[in-house]
Amino acid sequence: MQYKLTRIDPDAANDQYPIGERETVADPLVEGQVHKNIFMGKLEDVLNSTVNWGRKNSLWPYNFGLSCCYVEMTTAFTAPHDIARFGAEVIRASPRQADFMVIAGTCFIKMAPVIQRLYEQMLEPKWVISMGSCANSGGMYDIYSVVQGVDKFLPVDVYIPGCPPRPEAFLQGLMLLQESIGQERRPLSWVVGDQGVYRADMPAQKDLKREQRIQVTNLRSPDEV
């Protein structure tokens, strides 16, 4: 699996997205095994897996919304959907206490600096979910006042399509984020191991399901599914 080195030096002046460099590398744990004995290599692998397991099963979202997609996001917190099953029910009112933020709705030009400021106030590790067509690509608002995709100024980890997406789509996006977090390579502390942040290049769902969708010959209306 290929990894993308998203942060080389935590104190670097050019660490701000999208100025910071992004380098595609191999799995740092596998490459580092050559210079370690069997015990230390296995111990580091187990520690990374354990820490990633704790991170992905205890994701605290930052509570803010931009448009109608936020209504669908909050619906996922109700009893019929029960987002608590994934450990993401603890809504935080401060970005300094949150693990990930969901850009749910239309992002206007005037709002972009505010969102970026909130993202910078979040502590590492942190992740971003882009929810809905407007957040992904500007949606139907191809005008001067709307940002044509929040990845223009934020590093997005998961894109959720739809206008607006259903709560089930948000839950699927959350599970994809958990899967990605389980493959990440982050420093275990400020003195242990490589201090770079490596994020796995996860395959897009449309690529994984393309063959299955091509084989579909019997098309039905949504009411019959």
Curated annotation (Swiss-Prot):
A Pfam family matched in the record: Oxidored_q6
Catalysed reactions, as listed in the record: a quinone + NADH + 5 H(+)(in) = a quinol + NAD(+) + 4 H(+)(out)
Compartment list: Cell inner membrane
Main location: membrane
GO BP field: aerobic respiration; electron transport coupled proton transport
Keywords: 4Fe-4S, Cell inner membrane, Cell membrane, Iron, Iron-sulfur, Membrane, Metal-binding, NAD, Quinone, Translocase, Transport, Ubiquinone
Cofactor: [4Fe-4S] cluster
Gene Ontology molecular-function annotations: 4 iron, 4 sulfur cluster binding; iron ion binding; NADH dehydrogenase (ubiquinone) activity; NADH:ubiquinone reductase (non-electrogenic) activity; quinone binding
Bilayer topology annotation: Peripheral membrane protein
Cofactor comment: Binds 1 [4Fe-4S] cluster.
Gene3D superfamilies: 3.40.50.12280
GO cellular component labels: plasma membrane; respiratory chain complex I
Domain of life, source organism: Bacteria
EC number, UniProt record: 7.1.1.-
Family: Belongs to the complex I 20 kDa subunit family.
Self-association state and partner proteins as the record states: NDH-1 is composed of 13 different subunits. Subunits NuoB, CD, E, F, and G constitute the peripheral sector of the complex.
Function per UniProt: NDH-1 shuttles electrons from NADH, via FMN and iron-sulfur (Fe-S) centers, to quinones in the respiratory chain. The immediate electron acceptor for the enzyme in this species is believed to be ubiquinone. Couples the redox reaction to proton translocation (for every two electrons transferred, four hydrogen ions are translocated across the cytoplasmic membrane), and thus conserves the redox energy in a proton gradient.
Protein name per UniProt: NADH-quinone oxidoreductase subunit B
Organism, scientific name: Pseudomonas paraeruginosa (strain DSM 24068 / PA7) (Pseudomonas aeruginosa (strain PA7))
